[in-house]
Amino acid sequence: MKLHEIAPQPGSTKRRRRVGRGVSAGQGASCGLGMRGQKSRSGTGTRPGFEGGQMPLYRRVPKLKHFPLVNPRQYTIVNLRKLASLPANTEVTLESLLKAKILTSNDGPLKVLGDGEITVPLKVKAAAFSNSAKEKITAAQGTWEEI
C-alpha cells in the first residue's frame, strides 16, 4: 500500500448537494426551500422557541418555585416511644429492631425521631437522628452514634 492508494471505504463519503444549478439538476429554482416565506429567505430564520407569534410554551407554563427531588433519600423511621420497651443498655441497630419485630420493613437506613419518651439508657446506632431524639437519648444517660 502506498500513500496515493489510500481511499475512504466505499459508501462512507457522500457528495455535497449542489443547489441552484438549473431545474434539471433536481435542486434548481428554489433550491429545496419551498416557495416563499421567512424560511426560504437568506439569513438565520427564527430563533429557537419561536412559534410564529403564538405565546410560546416556555412562557405559557408557570415558573415553578420548587420541585421534588428525583431520588430522595428513603429512611426506615422509628420513634423513641417504640424503643422505650427495650431493656437497659441494649444496642439498638436496624438489624436488632427487625429481629425484635419492633420494625416490620426495611425501607433504607435507620432514622430515629424524637416522638415519645425513654427512661432507660440505650446505645443507639443509626444513619440519622432528629435533634429532639439526640437530646432525649442523652437525657436518659444513653448514647447515640451516626453510622
Curated annotation (Swiss-Prot):
Domain of life: Bacteria
Membrane-spanning residues: none
InterPro entries for the chain: Ribosomal_uL15, Ribosomal_uL15/eL18, Ribosomal_uL15/eL18_sf, Ribosomal_uL15_bac-type
GO BP, sorted A to Z: translation
Entry-linked SUPFAM superfamilies: Ribosomal proteins L15p and L18e
Signal peptide: none
GO molecular function, one term: structural constituent of ribosome
Biased composition (Gly residues): 23-35
Chain residue ranges for the region called Disordered: 1-55
GO cellular component: cytosolic large ribosomal subunit
Keywords assigned: Ribonucleoprotein, Ribosomal protein, RNA-binding, rRNA-binding
Summary of the function given for this chain in its UniProt record: Binds to the 23S rRNA.
Quaternary structure annotation from Swiss-Prot or TrEMBL: Part of the 50S ribosomal subunit.
Family: Belongs to the universal ribosomal protein uL15 family.
Protein's name in the database: Large ribosomal subunit protein uL15
